[in-house]
Amino acid sequence: KQVQTPGGMWYTPVSGIWQTVWLESVPDRYIRRVDFCCTLEEAVLDVGDESLSGTVTVACPEGPFIAPLEGGRAVLRPANPRPWSPEDPFLYPVTIQAGEDRVESYFALRTLEIKTAGGRPRLCLNGAPYYFHGVLDQGYWSDGIFTPASPAAYEEDILAMKALGFNTLRKHIKVEPPLFYYACDRLGMAVFQDMVNNGDYRYLRDTVLPTLGFQTR
């Protein structure tokens, strides 16, 4: 939503490095990514390379357990699954060892789906209807525009919203650095992530036609 002539809902353009940048030395075969697909009982890990094998150590309250990493994937099943929610933001720390590479990460057990409850479709968290009470978060900072002065600023904003009774942030047309989402996961804040803008805007095409319909009584 950045234009050369800002006005209305269009913003002043900015530029520069606003995401995390780093240099990393890795072995020839390394863990390219860490993706989790979770249910309320298990998490399936994908490291992005089918040739990798190794181990995954999961920290649990009852003690750690080790699962094999085979074909770049691992199935992680805690003995006593504890679901994540804004009221109980429980995370499972994991250590992934594959060859000479080692990565530390985490996952949470959570489901989000639409189910019929009380005769109406409801947005459900972990199988039960849940009221997501949120605010719009545009990700601007008075001292850094798109970048906060410190990662601690993320936590301050999240905790301030929780203190006001909110459990959800709608991140508006901006993808934040991973530290923001980690803070939300750890502190118990749901995130509704907007897609970024990818073109021009036409009121008839983009607002009227997609919502045009007929109602009968």
Give the location of each predicted region.
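Active-site-adjacent "subsite" loops/lids of carbohydrate-active enzymes
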Residues: 133, 199-217
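Solvent-exposed loop/turn segments at secondary-structure junctions
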Residues: 175-176, 197-200
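Secreted/periplasmic carbohydrate-active enzymes, especially glycoside hydrolases
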Residues: 1-191, 217
